[in-house]
């Protein structure tokens, strides 16, 4: 039996995505958090805090952060979708082929407007 933990990618740097990724990082799960905002990604990487959604909450230093969607997905075995429902279709259209063979968990709430 092995203690190796599956690599995880969390797409979405809001409060829920950041919290999910941080909880996994705290348990030594190799996890990468993807978000669109380069300034926020830099801040989270350097300061270990998401000031927009989780101000004052210290994030685990093992949490990896990127704005490169392809890099985030490249080594992930499990992908959590924690993106707004308004962005869900657009993001899935970009990454659909990259999800083949991966476990995908959607944490997105709401429905996409017509």
Question: In which residue ranges do the predicted regions lie?
Answer:
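Rossmann-like NAD(P)(H) cofactor-binding subdomain of soluble oxidoreductases
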Residues: 59, 66-74, 78-114
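NAD(P)+-binding Rossmann beta1-loop-alpha1 motif at the extreme N-terminus of oxidoreductases
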Residues: 1-55, 65-67, 94
């Amino acid at each position: 039996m092995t203690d190796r933990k599956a690599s995880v990618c969390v797409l979405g740097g809001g409060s829920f995505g950041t919290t999910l990724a941080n909880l996994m990082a705290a348990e030594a799960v190799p996890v990468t958090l993807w978000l669109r905002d380069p300034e926020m990604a830099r801040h989270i990487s350097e300061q270990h805090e998401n000031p927009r959604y989780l101000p004052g909450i210290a994030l685990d230093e093992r949490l990896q952060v990127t704005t490169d969607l392809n890099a985030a997905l490249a080594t992930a075995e499990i992908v959590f979708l924690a993106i707004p429902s308004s962005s869900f279709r657009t993001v899935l259209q970009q990454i659909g082929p990259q999800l083949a063979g991966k476990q995908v968990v959607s944490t997105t709430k709401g429905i996409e407007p017509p």
